[in-house]
């Protein structure tokens, strides 16, 4: 949901801070673990509500709208989508690659259960601060859990990848659904979550 009492200048400061952070990742492209200092900075970015939510992901083709939390703790993944903390924040820009993780097949929540129904050419949107970032799916891969090469930043590209376990119920591999940034067609709007995410409370994902 949009946070009131933030003006355009403050939004721009928030965007700049997140983009600066993403630029810093380019100097450490193969670091998969953040330092304590990096973790503190990371957790503070895009968290205007003070509840760990950095935005929302909308996937129209499978009727999904879920909050995106900092990090991929199990307490997050049980009820929402988590952002891999060593990847780019979801603010777009050339030389960025945001990776979002979600569970499938949980009895209590749908989450990324229907991700396998998506196909190349479908779109998904990230609602972040006062903007919408739209991505068109251009690649769907099935990989071993330890294969992180497809998640790395590609110079000059603006990418976002959704990741979940597969095959359904076995979970021996990972499905990577990647999109490249395209022009958004819709205006930012108030977010109203009525499905899985309604159960989320800040204390459930507190450190």
Which residue stretches match the model-derived regions?
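Solvent-exposed, non-transmembrane regions of membrane-associated and secreted proteins
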Residues: 1-207
């Amino acid at each position: 949901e949009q946070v009131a009492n933030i003006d355009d200048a403050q939004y721009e400061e928030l965007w700049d801070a997140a983009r600066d952070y993403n630029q810093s990742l380019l100097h450490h492209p193969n670091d998969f673990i953040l330092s304590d200092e990096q973790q503190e900075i990371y957790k503070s970015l895009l968290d205007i509500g003070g509840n760990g939510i950095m935005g929302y992901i909308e996937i129209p083709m499978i009727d999904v709208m879920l909050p995106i939390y900092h990090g991929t703790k199990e307490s997050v993944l049980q009820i929402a989508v988590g952002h891999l903390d060593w990847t780019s924040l979801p603010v777009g820009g050339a030389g960025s690659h945001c990776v979002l993780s979600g569970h499938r097949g949980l009895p209590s929540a749908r989450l990324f259960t229907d991700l396998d129904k998506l196909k190349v050419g479908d779109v998904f949107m990230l609602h972040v601060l006062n903007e919408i970032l739209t991505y068109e799916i251009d690649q769907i891969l099935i990989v071993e859990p330890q294969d992180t090469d497809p998640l790395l930043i590609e110079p000059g590209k603006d990418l976002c990848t959704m990741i979940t376990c597969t095959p359904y119920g076995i979970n021996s591999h990972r499905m990577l659904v990647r999109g490249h940034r395209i022009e958004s067609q819709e205006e930012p709007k108030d977010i109203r979550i009525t499905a899985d995410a309604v159960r989320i409370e800040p204390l459930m994902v507190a450190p």
